[in-house]
Amino acid sequence: MTDSSRWVNRPVQLGLVGNLENRRIRDFCSRWQALGQPTPTLIDYQDLPESTPRVDVLRIDSPGENVALATQLIELGGGPKKAPLEHGEVAYLREFHLGFCALLERIRAWGLPAFNAPDEIAVMFDKWQSHQRFVSAGVSRPPASLAPASFVEWQQQRADHGRIFLKPLHGSSGSGVCALRWTRTQQQLQSPLRIVGGRLFNSLHVQKYETWAQIEFILARLLPQGMIEETWIPKLSLPDGAVDVRVLVIAGAARHHVVRQSRSPMTNLHLGNRRADSNGLDAPLEAAFRLAEQAAACFGNSLYAGVDVLLDQRGRVYIGEINAFGDLLPGLISHDEDAYTAIARAHLGI
C-alpha cells in the first residue's frame, strides 16, 4: 500500500493478478466497477507479461485452486517438469512456494504500487517467517519452532507424551495441518488429509489416524517439505464446540470477522464447521480485534490481511496465522459493506 492509494474523483485502472477463472477475480471486478471505476485489466498468473502493465495499481490474488498453475509453479520452484499432481493432492509444497515467490519477484520488478506488496505476500505465505516477525514485534503467538526434516529425527526427539500442531510452512486453508497428541500407550493425529493410493489429499472432513504407522506415513511425506511445530493452545469451548475467529483487517482497522466453531481442532469453515454466534464474546472478541490489528501492522505495505486469532479458556488471545488472501468472506457485512467493497473503498479513499 503506497501514497498512490488516494484517487478520489478520478478513475483508477486496476490490474487484477490471479487465476482468471476464479470467483475471487470475478467478484472483485464486480465490486470495483460498482464504485464507478473502469473494468480492471486482468493479468493471468500463467501468462505474466514481461513488460510493465499499463495500470495504476495491482491487486495480487491467490494462486490456489488451479492445477495447471500449480504444476507450472512447482517446475519454476525446482520441482519436476509436469509434476503428476492431482486435484487436492498435497505434494511439492516447498517447490510451489519457491515458484510463487519467483512470480511475485517478477511482479515486484514492474515497479507498480500494489494493494499488498509482493514481498510481504511472500512472507505471509511462510509461517516461520511470519512467526519470527510477530515475535520480534511482541505480538502474541503460541510457542513454536521449526520441525525436524524427517520423521525419524522427529521421533528421536519427541517426549513420552505431548500435544502439538504440525503445520506446513507453506500452505493455507488448513492444507496439511496436523493436530497430534500422544502418550506412552496411545496416539492420535487429526487432519483433513486423506491417504489414497499411497498419496496425500486434502478432504472436506477432519480424519483421525490412531496408529504410529499411519502417522509416520503422513509425517514422513510432510516433514521434508518443511513444517512448523506449534504448542497446542486449547481453544475457548462453548456448548457446541471450540471457537476461534477470522478477522479481516483493512487499512489498519479490524472490520469483518467470523467466529468459527468446531468439535475438532480445525475450525476452517470448508471442513464442515459452522459460523458461531458471538453473543457473550464481547471481551475476547475486542481483544482479538486489537491483536489482529497488531499482527497486520507488522506488514505495513499491505492494505489488508485475514488474521486467525485463537481464544483460550482464560481469555487470552494468540495469533494463529496471517493470510494475504484471507478476504474471501462471502456474506459478511461490516458498516454496510462486504469485504471486497470495503477493500476497494479503502484504497480509493471513499
Language-model-derived ranges and their functions:
Residues 19-31, 35-148:
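Conserved N-proximal alpha/beta basic substrate-recognition cap immediately N-terminal to
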Residues 18-21, 47, 170, 233, ...:
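Short, flexible loop/turn elements at secondary-structure junctions
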